[in-house]
Amino acid sequence: MDTFSTKNLALQAQKKLLSKMASKTVANVFIDDTSSEILDELYRATKEYTHNRKEAQKIIKNLIKIVMKLGVLYRNGQFSPEELLVMERFRKKVHTLAMTAVSFHQIDFTFDRRVVSSVLTECRDLLHQAVSSHLTAKSHSRINHVFNHFADYEFLSALYGPAEPYRTHLKRICEGVNKMLEEDNI
């Protein structure tokens, strides 16, 4: 039986094209202004923490690629009913993460890096589970790269610490996340 399918070919082409084009300019077509501002602040905080512009760019670029590929898969109805259930659990976990991140910022002395790291790790695992049959090993390593960076205890401690410029970055990130929560976009 011939397994050629133009739908599958088009989907592969979209995913390949997105992986080659995941720059901030292209992302602006797919990502709203608030999300873009959050990504900018995550980039600045990551660059400050790693002292490595290229590494910070790579982390954010990988994050953008993941989001864009998820969008392509979802828009093209590629998820099975079981995978859609996992994606719904992932969405709820991301919502919990957003609320937790904002609350830790707003209420002094409540931050616990173990909680944030644990929720990020759960998000990563759910995402792997949902896309296991759709993305390449390279895409799965991108997921690990992004989530492992943001779940790192030392990074979280720096981000939520009292020192500048992290305080300013965190404030702006949380303002954006809070706006997305209010608009029910997360």
UniProtKB/Swiss-Prot annotation:
InterPro entries assigned to the protein according to its UniProt record, in alphabetical order: TNFAIP8-like (IPR008477), TNFAIP8_sf (IPR038355)
One GO cellular component, as annotated: cytoplasm
TM segment ranges: none
Keywords carried by this UniProt record: Cytoplasm
Subcellular localization, as worded in the UniProt entry: Cytoplasm
Keyword Cytoplasm: yes
Major location (coarse): cytoplasm
GO terms (BP aspect): negative regulation of TOR signaling; regulation of apoptotic process
Domain of life: Eukaryota
Record flagged with keyword Chaperone: no
UniProt similarity note: Belongs to the TNFAIP8 family.
Protein name (record): Tumor necrosis factor alpha-induced protein 8-like protein 1
